[in-house]
């Protein structure tokens, strides 16, 4: 995402923020006010005789962040044996997992298991059966913030004309959410000795006795293991505690281990880079998604341990994971038990004891007591196999070679031809040049202030490497999300890697906030400050300052503030903040979900131990040599820190202060983009139905001018051909294995609730079992819509 001031790179940020450094002022005329209404501002001045400097990147660093194949990124859950090249169990998991392949089998069975729902109908897969998401249209509406369906009903069947839910240009401002239908309201009673779950039917104030719909659109479970945290609001923590989604935030969470075959003892665990496990243990107990109210994981374990795995569903004998467990004579389910699968998958210390475990006054076996642990770890390992990294764009990106300034010198464009052919068969005509221009718009830097339009590269009739719209500021790296494990622990950009090496916490940063609730104002004087002084902590109000363009001319700007936020979570103006706080909400323990605000709360001292990146300022002398003028004595606690001596880049950031302003309210996780063609409806609200609507949303600068929006979210002024090019690029991110349900994306049969009839009975849709070779019939887009259509 945008930085306060540039890192060592990417120099796209330099062009965007125009605060990379200082150089002698030029005499060029400044841009017009109309051209730079949305320009960003500088809060730092150079020493006398110097001015803002924008220069070429350091040697070996491209002037943009190129899109890369996901094959270049290590799987954060399943490692690779460096000798054989085969998948290998991660070292920290070996203490718990005895057989990785057996655990993956267990995880796939758990994920697709309809009997896990209190009604024996809702599995994890029920909301994630198509490209990792939910493609149903009926009984999917949640009433949103106002509590009413705005002329529709809970059992309403969505149609194309309903979208977009919100669009100021169309006079639409609907707060309904396209969520996922779960279970009917009920209260848990018991599990019988034969695995029958008894519940008492209930009624919900909004949904009555119908299936309830979630208040957030279902995110994809494909590539989900690359996320540092999961769920749109980030509540599924990076570290798994074995019990619930909240990781180390829940100090009481613990599992049990067999200290002997006759004794058990509590065990507190913290398994890092395991947010998929944290996420997996949430829905099975959620009274809207899968469970009767009051059911516990030991009770769910008691039930499933008594039932035939996948006993209500057909499994293909050629299933890439479960085929070996299918009975030779056919029929439904697997020819094994969940108890046997657990004992094969996990170390004996996790299940081998006859001693009872007493929980809430009830006695359970060790296997029942640890069922949440098995569930989370096994599903995480299964989801770690659901990696879509073979799209035509992934294949093409792997062939690109760049020269020192970012021009492509070698490539294999023919790898994009299957996208063109596939769409042509549907009557949708694009070219490989459309895809490549969309890629350019996605990955190339935003042009500097005062430059009209988006000058293309030489390939498309312009000069140089071309310019873009900054998509990959948030959709960064091969993972196409700044919320990735790699970005938040090691860094994707070269500058972030350097910050990590310097001891900075990459989970947070200080950033210019757009605050488009404020009007554009005339230039105002901004007094010089000592180089290196930290203005951002002590001047958090809405102040008007001079914009420094590449020639140093001040033009009208919006008042800008600089606040701290959680990297990877952004408010892009989908809905008003008060309707859903996102990562600005709280966990069940009353603490902020946001790392930034959580660390501010839990540290007693005014300044925390977390070093938060803010940026740097480099100046050049009359000869163009980079220098760092000595700073005057400062009261700022961050003065004098140096990130990269080779580039003389002083840091103007430091420990997170308890008192500094934050911008986390209304922010949601940046999703990855692979298979996005098939993951509609879009955004956490599910309010857009096609990729064209998504691109139009960003072209408008969002739908709501929220105060917590990043400054980069602004009207883009895209032409129709540029919007279509971006859609073409996004379609090229579809992995055909996902589209055709080929291994590892094959699956058991699933009988999916899809609304109710006039008598109140479930309407169901059967998703047939598919084996490793996939299906001849590809999956469909949401409502079978053309991704290039505005409606």
Residue spans of the language-model regions?
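Bacterial N-terminal signal peptides that target proteins for export
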Residues: 1-12
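Periplasmic c-type cytochrome electron-transfer domains
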Residues: 23-791
């Amino acid at each position: 995402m945008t930085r306060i001031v540039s890192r060592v790179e990417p120099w796209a940020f330099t062009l965007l923020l125009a605060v990379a450094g200082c150089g002698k002022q030029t005499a060029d005329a400044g841009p017009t006010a109309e051209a730079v209404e949305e320009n960003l501002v500088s809060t730092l001045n150079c020493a006398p005789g110097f001015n803002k400097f924008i220069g070429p990147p350091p040697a070996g660093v491209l002037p943009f962040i190129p899109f890369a194949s996901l094959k270049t990124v290590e799987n954060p859950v399943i490692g690779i044996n460096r000798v054989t090249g085969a998948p290998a169990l991660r070292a920290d998991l070996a203490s718990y997992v005895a057989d990785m392949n057996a655990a993956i089998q267990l995880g796939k069975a758990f994920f697709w298991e309809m009997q896990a729902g209190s009604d024996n109908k809702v599995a994890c897969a029920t909301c994630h059966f198509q490209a990792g998401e939910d493609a149903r249209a009926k009984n999917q509406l949640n009433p949103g913030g106002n509590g009413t369906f705005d002329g529709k009903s809970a059992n309403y069947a969505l149609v194309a004309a309903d979208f977009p839910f919100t669009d100021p240009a169309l006079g639409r401002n609907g707060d309904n959410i396209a969520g996922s239908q779960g279970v009917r309201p009920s209260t848990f009673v018991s599990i019988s000795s034969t695995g029958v779950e008894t519940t008492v039917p209930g009624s919900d104030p909004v949904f009555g006795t119908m299936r309830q719909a979630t208040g957030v659109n279902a995110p994809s479970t494909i590539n989900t293991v690359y996320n540092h945290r999961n769920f749109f609001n980030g509540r599924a923590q990076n570290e798994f505690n074995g019990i619930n989604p909240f990781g180390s935030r829940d100090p009481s969470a613990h599992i049990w281990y067999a200290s002997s075959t006759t004794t058990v003892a509590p065990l507190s665990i913290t398994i890092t880079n395991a947010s998929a496990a944290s996420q997996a243990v949430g829905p099975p107990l959620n009274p809207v998604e899968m469970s009767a109210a009051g059911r516990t994981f030991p009770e769910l374990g008691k039930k499933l341990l008594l039932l035939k795995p996948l006993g209500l569903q057909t499994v293909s004998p050629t299933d890439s994971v479960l085929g070996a467990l299918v009975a030779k004579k056919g029929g439904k389910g697997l020819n094994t038990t969940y108890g046997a699968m657990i004992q094969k998958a996990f170390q004996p210390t996790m299940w081998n004891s006859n001693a009872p475990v007493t929980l809430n006054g009830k006695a359970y076996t060790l296997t029942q007591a640890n069922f949440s642990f098995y569930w989370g770890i096994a599903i995480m390992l299964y989801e770690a196999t659901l990696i879509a990294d073979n799209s035509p764009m992934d294949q093409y990106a792997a062939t690109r070679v760049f020269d020192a300034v970012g021009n492509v010198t070698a490539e294999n464009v023919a790898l994009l031809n299957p996208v063109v052919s596939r769409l042509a068969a549907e009557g949708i005509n694009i070219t490989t040049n459309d895809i490549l221009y969309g890629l350019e718009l996605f990955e190339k830097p935003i042009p500097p202030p005062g430059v009209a339009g988006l000058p293309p590269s030489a390939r498309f009739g312009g000069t140089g490497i071309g310019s873009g719209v900054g998509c990959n500021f948030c959709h960064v790296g091969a993972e196409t999300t700044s919320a990735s494990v790699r970005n938040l622990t090691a860094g994707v950009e070269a500058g972030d890697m350097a910050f990590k090496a310097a001891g900075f916490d990459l989970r947070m940063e200080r950033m210019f906030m757009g605050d488009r609730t404020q009007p554009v104002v005339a230039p105002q004087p901004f007094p010089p400050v000592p180089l290196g002084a930290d203005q951002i902590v002590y001047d958090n109000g809405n102040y008007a300052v001079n914009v420094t363009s590449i020639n140093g001319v001040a033009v009208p700007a919006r008042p800008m503030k600089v606040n701290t936020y959680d990297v990877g979570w952004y408010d892009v103006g989908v809905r008003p903040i008060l309707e859903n706080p996102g990562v600005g909400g709280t966990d069940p323990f009353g603490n902020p979900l946001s790392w930034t605000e959580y660390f501010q709360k839990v540290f007693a001292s005014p300044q925390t131990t977390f070093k938060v990146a803010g940026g740097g300022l480099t100046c050049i002398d009359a000869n163009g040599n980079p220098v760092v003028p000595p700073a005057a004595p400062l009261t700022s606690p961050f003065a004098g820190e140096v990130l990269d001596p080779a580039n003389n880049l002083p840091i103007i950031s430091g420990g997170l202060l308890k008192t500094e302003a934050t911008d986390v309210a209304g922010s949601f996780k940046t999703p990855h983009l692979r298979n996005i063609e098939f993951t509609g409806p879009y955004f956490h609200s599910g309010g857009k139905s096609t990729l064209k609507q998504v691109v139009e949303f960003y072209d408008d600068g969002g739908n709501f001018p929220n105060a917590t929006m990043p400054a980069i979210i602004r009207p883009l002024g895209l032409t129709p051909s540029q919007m279509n090019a971006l859609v073409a690029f996004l379609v090229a991110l579809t992995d055909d294995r996902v589209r055709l349900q080929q291994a590892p994306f094959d699956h058991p049969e699933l009988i999916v609730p899809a609304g109710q009839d006039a008598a109140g009975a479930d309407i169901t849709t059967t998703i047939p079992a598919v084996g490793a070779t996939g299906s001849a019939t590809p999956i469909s887009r949401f409502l079978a819509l053309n991704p290039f259509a505005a409606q």
